[in-house]
Regions:
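Non-globular, low-confidence helical/coil segments that flank catalytic cores
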Residues: 1-305
């Protein structure tokens, strides 16, 4: 009887192990499929993601209403491009904290309009920052006075940027494409720092509020994986010449819901559609995130449109 019992137990145990292994394989395959098909992202909204989750280059297009604030991270390095309006600064700091940022290597202010620089003083007061980067401007006195107001008592150095300057962000590189050194530009939008971020062959173009005239002056660039559309989707930017040259796979637009300017303008959306770009907007989808993982760009949004 004992032998018979053992003979029945062994096959039963084998079947249990076999069935369990098969179930585990199916589960692993299902998880692998979800993660690599892009469906996984729908179950992991980016609102709770942190910069440290991915050592590669990541861009967060923050939801600051009718303004712009872009966080770039690579490894443990962080750069903030603009801050949005002063009234959005505390919310921006909360978002940066949620994304794991406790200090900044750089704060880039693309140009001195309140929807881009309004929160600069608050950010510099709250976060240790190595370098404040502002665009070269012919009125140096005004430039230094404005920068001094932002800096206050912050222990942060000031750097004046112009085309050709490069800034290391971990293994990523940020290159200034505009404005030129010693320029006499008097249109504040066209004074915008235009930045090219590069990492493992992936390129992101950040245009500030620069107009089509400036866009055309920095061409040719070749293919760009992600474009942060200029001037919140205004018809004055994101021109056909730029789009024909860079053929972006994705375009982010930072704008406020039901804003008084009507951003993004229909003409810009039509141009982007014609160029084949997938468009995501902060007014519709909240925080937008672009991560470079194994040489490929993965884009997610805080909420569905």
């Amino acid at each position: 009887m004992k032998r018979a019992s053992r003979q029945k137990t062994a096959p039963s145990l084998f079947r249990a192990l076999r069935d369990g292994a098969a179930g585990l394989c199916i589960l692993c395959f299902a998880l692998f499929f979800l993660k690599n098909s892009g469906i996984w992202a729908k179950f992991r909204p980016n609102a709770g993601e942190t910069a440290s989750e991915n050592g590669g280059l990541t861009l967060f297009c923050e939801d600051v209403g009718q303004g712009q604030a872009l966080l770039l991270t690579c490894g443990d390095r962080a750069a903030l491009v603009d801050t949005g309006l002063a009234g959005k600064a505390e919310g921006l700091l909360d978002a940066l904290s949620d994304q794991g940022v406790t200090r900044l290597d750089y704060l880039f202010i693309t140009h001195p309009h309140s929807d881009h620089c309004g929160g600069a003083k608050t950010v510099l007061s709250a976060l240790p920052t190595d370098l404040l980067v502002v665009p070269d401007y012919y009125d140096k006195d005004a430039l230094y006075i404005q920068a001094g107001e932002w800096l206050g008592a912050a222990d942060t150095a000031l750097d004046i940027a112009y085309a050709g300057r490069e800034y290391a962000l971990g293994s990523a590189k940020l290159t200034v494409l505009s404005p030129p050194q010693g320029n006499d530009i008097d249109d504040m939008n066209d004074l915008s720092l235009v930045l090219l971020a590069e990492y493992t062959g992936v390129k992101m173009l950040l245009c500030g509020d620069a107009s089509q005239t400036i866009e055309e002056s920095i061409l040719p660039l070749g293919h760009i994986d992600l474009l942060v559309a200029g001037h919140h989707g205004s018809r004055t930017a994101t021109g056909e010449a730029l789009l024909d040259d860079i053929t972006p796979a994705y375009a982010f637009i930072s704008c406020g819901r039901d804003n008084e300017y009507g951003h993004p303008h229909r003409e810009v959306l039509d141009r982007l559609e014609k160029a084949g770009a997938q468009v995501l907007r902060t007014d519709e989808s909240g925080v937008l995130t672009a991560r470079v993982i194994q040489g490929k760009l993965r884009v997610t949004a805080e909420r569905d449109q």
